[in-house]
């Protein structure tokens, strides 16, 4: 393919920059900020940026590339929501879809859903770095958080992602444990909880469907409150 930014459609490249940053740079935002500051102060006559991962950047896109890294390194997110969930029998997935529909109906355009058993972890992390609201749903498995969800939570923890909104939901058959074990993640990460955690026993009832929709609306309202 092409080598220079001016010769290609960059829409895919911006998404890849998010994905690379989330997976590789992640927690080192303070160091990125220091480098960006030094670079600006040096005022070097740069003609090309030859990145090891991505195209050769020309001055036409310098500001966009620097602005994106500046925002990511400050954990500044776009308006949007990431619903990540695990499901064993499909019940948690139904609730995930319901919450996502409530968010969209509340006026939020960017709503992404990830079944953690199938979505690549790199794509999930990319979207968490990109969007402000994170909604985590898990069934209870052997009195614990579903393992794929637990793994993603650990990846988020290692990257020290800051300044996000968190909502929690889940399902169980015998004894509900997953939801109550996810809730403390908000305090651990310094995130703001939005809405009351939702938990269903087995399949979704009409009442819980309504509550899922309402939670989605609350998330949308919290996101819209940040508009200026």
Where are these regions (language model features)?
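FMN-binding flavodoxin-like domain, especially the glycine-rich phosphate-binding loop
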Residues: 3-50, 54-56, 98-112, 124-228
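Terminal amphipathic helices with adjacent charged low-complexity linkers/tails
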Residues: 48-81
């Amino acid at each position: 393919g092409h080598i220079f930014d001016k010769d290609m459609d960059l829409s895919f490249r911006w998404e890849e920059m998010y994905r690379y940053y989330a997976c590789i740079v992640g927690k080192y935002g303070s160091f990125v900020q220091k480098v960006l500051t030094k670079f600006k102060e040096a005022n070097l006559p740069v003609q090309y940026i030859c990145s090891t991962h991505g195209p050769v950047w020309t001055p036409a896109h310098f500001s966009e590339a620097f602005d994106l890294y500046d925002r990511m390194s400050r954990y500044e997110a776009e308006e949007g929501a990431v619903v990540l969930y695990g499901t064993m029998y499909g019940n948690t997935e139904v609730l995930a879809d319901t919450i996502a529909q409530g968010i969209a109906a509340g006026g939020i355009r960017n709503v992404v859903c990830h079944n953690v058993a199938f979505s690549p972890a790199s794509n999930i992390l990319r979207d968490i770095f990109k969007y402000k609201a994170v909604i985590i749903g898990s069934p209870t498995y052997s009195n614990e958080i579903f393992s794929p969800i637990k793994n993603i939570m650990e990846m988020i923890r290692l990257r020290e992602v800051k300044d996000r909104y968190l909502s929690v939901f889940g399902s169980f058959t015998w004894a509900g444990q997953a939801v109550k074990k996810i809730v403390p993640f908000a305090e651990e990460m310094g995130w703001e909880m939005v809405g009351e955690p939702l938990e269903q026993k087995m399949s979704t009832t009409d009442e819980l469907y309504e509550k899922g929709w309402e939670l989605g609306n609350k998330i949308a309202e919290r996101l819209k409150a940040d508009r200026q």
